[in-house]
Every structure is written in structure tokens, then in C-alpha cells.
Amino acid sequence: MSSNTFTVDDIYVEVVRLSIHELEEYFKRLEVYSREKISCPFVIRLDGVGFGKALKDFEQPRDPKVHSALVKTCYELMRFFNCSVCYTTSDEISMFFLNYVPYNGRVEKIVSITAAVASANLSIQLNRSLYFDSRVIKVDLRDLEKYYLYRVRTGFNNYICQLYHKVFKDRKTPHLDQMIAELKKQGVNIAEKPKWALYGSLIHWTTIEKIGYNPITGEKVVAERRILMTTESPERALKIIKELKSKVA
């Protein structure tokens, strides 16, 4: 037997003599971004990875079944992370954190778990393996409406481009106004498309009153309950964001 060969007893001794604490401290220092932290307000944006190929058998562009699944995924994210609002369009989700920071603000933890929860939830709903990447955008309160409109504009532009190239397969992409005008000439009227396809959906918390009865006294009681709702109106979405800002400013 070679002198360099470990026996079971040798390996046992080698493992036992190692200091877990020292090794943990050593490799913790080598972790990338382990010390990075974020504070409110901030946005987590989740972008679908390879959704075009993975969802090619769905209606293109903007299958209502896919969008419905994305909205349901937002509901799960809202409940899991207790963020203020979620916005979804195309293959992306933006989570707005205005007054609560999960995982003590640890960026590494936040981006990995938000991507994991979103990927798992959407995969189950659409019965296929789907993946999101995740990034942190540090914003000021004054940036919130601008960020929302930025993602609305990006999603809107992508949708019009997809419609255009579905009709005009071999053309270069012209200016947005020209695409809309040429599509209309071909009978594709953007104004007739559903709002969720054009502008996405905002998921937000709201409070309702629920009437119940005191089991001891039999008296009627009114309790407040927080529920999730969806709006497809950009005007309404902006109003909701402004109201949330006023509560944390």
C-alpha cells in the first residue's frame, strides 16, 4: 500500500481534527456579495430566461394563459416576501419594496430566493421547467413612477415589435409610430388589444371590511382583512404607487 494512501481511520482523524468554525469563517470571507446589503426603497426585477423557446407552443405574442400564470406568481411573491406591489408584463416581474426588507437586506439571499420562488411557482402552473434571473435596483421614492412607466414602455414596445414581425416577417424594425400605423393598415388595431397585453398588470394589497359575529355575545363585528387585487389600468396603477409613496415618505 502506498504511503500516500489514506485508510478509513486516517480519513476519520483528518476530518475530525478540522475546525468547522475556522473553515466557515474562511470560506464566508470568500463568498462574493455576502456582505452586500440593501435598504428600502428598492425593486427586484425578475426576467424570464429563455422563455421564447420554452413557451413557443403558446399563443404569440402575449398568451393570456401565460400572463394569468405570471399574475398568480406575483400573488405568491407578494405573500411570501410581503412586498408593497408587483408589476408583470411580457416575461418579467418587478417587485417593489417600500417599507419592508426581507432577509435583513442581504442581496445575495434576496436575489437567489426571489428567483427560486418565481421559477418554481411558474413552472408548476405552466407544467414545464422555467427560470428567472433576479437583480436589485436601488431607487429613491421619486423614481417609483418613472421605473413603473419605464417597464410599461419596455413591455409595450416589445409587444408591438412582436406583433409587427408576426405580420411583416422579413422587415427591419421601424420606429414605434410607424409599426403601429402599418399594423393598423393590415387590420391590427392596437387600441382593440386588451390592456394587460399592452400595459401589463399591477398586483397590490387592499383592505376590505368583513362582517362576522362574536361567538360569545352573538353581536355583529366588523373586521378588516388585507387581500390582493390586480389592476390593468396604468392610470390606476400610478395612483396606487403614489398613495404607497405618501405612506412611507
Where are these regions (language model features)?
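Regulatory and interdomain segments flanking nucleotide-handling catalytic cores
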Residues: M1-A249
